């Protein structure tokens, strides 16, 4: 499955550029080990989660992800000789990365879950933070926030990003390049009490593309592969060799 390998290797490359991680990767040679854990993580997740229901899907995701963090952390310490500090950093990065991929998946599949949406800026005079409210078909309240670091994201751009998904940007580069000048995050916070009183447990973040990714996706016309990869991760992992 080429898409999975591409995603995981690009994530690992980003980790290697992080100064806090460089020594860990160089001394422990963990690249192939972490790639194996990626495959194990997604295979296990697919076997436990098959529902299109947003409540059960997200609850299962958080429970599985937290449990896997403990397993991965322990394996880094016991099998790879990492210090507790090193193992914590790597396991946190791992959890953050799989969280990003899941958030991307939910955004691209938004229409399958969401029944109605409204748009309400946090501060109409400051487009740095813009919010939308959505309600899923099974009654889950979802707050969607775009942290717009450079302040140039207008209403239409936000609506296309949050409501119709990142796919819109990749298929409409003429509209995307005008405002994707700085990296930003999309935060999905599931606030319904059926999840948890601690809303942070159910917050998914995805880093939206910045200048270098614009070059990669739009110049190479690689967005179809990206779209397919999100589905492949959850649907076709039994074919990974």
Predicted regions and their residues:
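Interdomain/boundary linker segments immediately adjacent to catalytic/signaling cores
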Residues: 1-102
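Non-catalytic C-terminal interaction segments of nucleic acid-processing enzymes
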Residues: 207-241
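Catalytic cores of nucleic-acid endonucleases
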Residues: 141, 146-216
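Extended, compositionally biased low-complexity polar/Lys-Gly-rich tracts
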Residues: 64, 100, 107, 130-134, ...
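Catalytic centers of nucleases
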Residues: 94, 98-166
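Solvent-exposed amphipathic alpha-helical surface segments
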Residues: 110, 172, 237-240
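Glycine-rich, flexible loop segments associated with nucleotide phosphate handling
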Residues: 88-95, 127-130, 180-184
């Amino acid at each position: 499955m080429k898409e999975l390998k591409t995603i995981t290797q690009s994530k690992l490359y980003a980790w290697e550029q992080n100064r806090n991680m460089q020594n860990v990767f160089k001394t422990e040679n963990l690249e192939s080990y972490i790639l194996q854990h990626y495959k194990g993580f997604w295979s296990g997740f697919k076997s436990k989660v098959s529902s299109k229901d947003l409540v059960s899907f997200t609850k299962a995701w958080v429970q599985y992800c937290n449990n896997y963090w403990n397993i991965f952390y322990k394996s880094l310490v016991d099998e790879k000789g990492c210090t507790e500090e090193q193992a914590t950093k790597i396991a946190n990065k791992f959890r953050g990365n799989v969280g990003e991929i899941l958030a991307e998946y939910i955004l691209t599949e938004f229409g399958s879950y969401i029944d109605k949406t409204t748009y309400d800026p946090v501060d109409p005079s400051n487009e740095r933070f813009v919010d939308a409210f959505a309600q899923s078909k099974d009654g889950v309240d979802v707050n969607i926030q775009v942290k717009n670091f450079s302040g140039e994201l207008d209403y239409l751009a936000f609506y296309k990003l949050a409501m119709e998904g990142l796919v819109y940007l990749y298929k409409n580069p003429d509209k995307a390049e005008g405002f994707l000048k700085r990296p930003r995050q999309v935060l999905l916070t599931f606030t319904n009490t059926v999840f948890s009183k601690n809303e942070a447990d159910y917050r998914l973040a995805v880093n939206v593309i910045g200048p270098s990714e614009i070059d990669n996706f739009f110049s190479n016309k690689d967005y179809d592969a990206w779209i397919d990869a999100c589905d492949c991760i959850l649907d076709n992992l039994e074919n990974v060799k």
